[in-house]
Amino acid sequence: MSATNGPQPQDLNRIVLDYLAKKGYSRTEAMLRLEASGSGVSVEEKLKSIEETPDAYTHTYTILRDWVDSSLELYKAELHRILFPIFVHSYLNLLSQDHYEAAKQFYELFKDDHTDLHDFDVKNLKSLSLPSHVAEDRTAQQYRQNKYQLHFSRITFDLLLHFLFENVSNGGSIIIKLINQHIDIHIVPGRPTVLENAKVINEQEGITGQSFERGDAQLQPVKLQQMPMDKEMEKIVEMDLEEEDMMHQNDPNNQSPKLLKEFRKLHEPNAEDAPSRDYIPLPPHKGVDILSEVEAVKDWSKRLHLGPRASLPSVCMYTFHHTNNNMNCAEFSPDSTMIACGFQESYIRLWSIKADKKSLPKSTSVEDSDGSVRLLSHSGPVYGTTFSPDNKYLLSCSEDASARLWSVDTKTALVAYKGHTGPVWDVAFGPFGHYFATASHDQTAQLWSCDHIYPLRVFAGHLSDVDCVTFHPNSAYVLTGSSDKTCRLWDVHRGHSVRVFNGHTQPVTAVAIAPDGHTMASADSEGLIHLWDIGTGRRIKTMRGHRGNIYSLSFSRESTVLVSGGSDCTVRAWDVFKTNYNNPVSSSLTGSVVTPFSAKTSTFNEVNWSTSPDQMVALYTKQTPIFNVSFTRRNLCLAISVS
């Protein structure tokens, strides 16, 4: 009789659960587990039986946090990631239900759990106090309109489910609702992941737009090699370089390598990983382009060799005094003969840094007593400036929602480009000078050409202000950094995002792409620098040492050294290829530190911080923040500080 009995309900549940797990149906599996653990009581009945009182959120979060903290170390790192989105949406739910006092108490009790990784968002949420604030605030709507992405191993996910099912009547139902509405958990194969640095979030965690867009973006192929040179131009350049080699072949004082040989090294054909010549339309080459290429090869042959096995970078610092906090930006010209600065009073000042001071011809513009020239046209503070590669033109961007093109020779405004609907924070010329890009408060970046007054491409996808922008060396891509704490790489030809770099916990303040085109660096307002592999979209390492906003990044010509400057009054050099697997050590024991007396006695130097092992040197100023760092074509580092 017993042999003819069918399988028991427990066996059926186990068989179905195993099948669902193999097929990856995690949501269906979760619901079945809930049903199976209910002893005849349905999931809906259990969830409805829990009243979401103001005190229930505090109780629920407390039991979840206590359980996570008591978990095994192997699983604790992954489980901790669930706490922040639960904290955010519990707080927003309380505000939406008009329980301000309970929300305030909840915030004060648990905010310290998340200030290390999410300080920026935690501080923004503090200003909310009414249901209407939740509906209108940008940060709140980012979390309400986009699901928070988490990646758990199978074991970690099962542990979380088991805990929630056991505590359905003790607050687990509230967490289940929050996860279902606002969190997207992806199951990944393998063991639980453990981050080596607790102050860096997982690059796949958080909100970066729609999850399918991010996944597709990381899989799209990219062409990162240098764009091939025009064949006719290449022949002319080779002829000129060959003549130069012939002129100096008998000169005993000439120790530079053969220019033609260096040129061919720089332009080795690599059709597989390079965009085609017609991928990005460019105007015909001019005589000045040939001269510029010849000079670039000469500078390359005379460059300083930098790196841990060669020499540390030399830094030439220009300090601007008595700016009264009115200077917003500063930029060197590509030939290192001029500096352009933007000011709060809506003008630009142009300086010559050549010894003879002849690089600024007389013009009708306003000339100051210090020899600088004022450029007047904007109607709001100027936030960004950039020179064209041939040093003939200057671009600026302003709060007046426009970018303007200036002639360096005549010191006059030539064109106003109006396409943004908010202040323009940054502007960058492309490597060939024909195209430029702008970054704006309206959450977009735009691509322009100098001969059109309307944008050619609008790069939309960031969830907050686009704060910084730069071009890839082959001009086929534009890189942006945003206050949404992500960076994006955009295809200029198609106008789509092809890479999303997620991992910062603060707004991105500076970005740079290495001359080799395969590596990029991004920095944030907390002082962290992330190094990324553009091809795979994955983070290589995190560099720590700065203690505040980082304003500027620049790679050496060989892409082996990165320099950074920021509000902590230091210029720091980093070894790009050194790994950071070892534990961080005290900054006084890492690399070289050059510190003046005034910096040693300043208050912010008393703060205890750690520096990653790849820092090569830290150079301190006399309490003047660094606005710009830039390598010349000969690998001399130029920097600008402001008092």
Curated annotation (Swiss-Prot):
Keywords: Nucleus, Phosphoprotein, Repeat, Transcription, Transcription regulation, WD repeat. Pfam families: LisH, TFIID_NTD2, WD40. InterPro entries: G-protein_beta_WD-40_rep (IPR020472), LisH (IPR006594), TFIID_NTD2 (IPR007582), TFIID_NTD2_sf (IPR037264), WD40/YVTN_repeat-like_dom_sf (IPR015943), WD40_repeat_CS (IPR019775), WD40_repeat_dom_sf (IPR036322), WD40_rpt (IPR001680). Its main location: nucleus. WD repeats lie at residues 322-361, 377-416, 419-458, 461-500, 503-542, 545-584. It is found in: Nucleus. The C-terminal WD40 motifs are required for its incorporation into TFIID and function in SAGA. Belongs to the WD repeat TAF5 family. This is SAGA complex/transcription factor TFIID complex subunit Taf5. It comes from Schizosaccharomyces pombe (strain 972 / ATCC 24843) (Fission yeast).
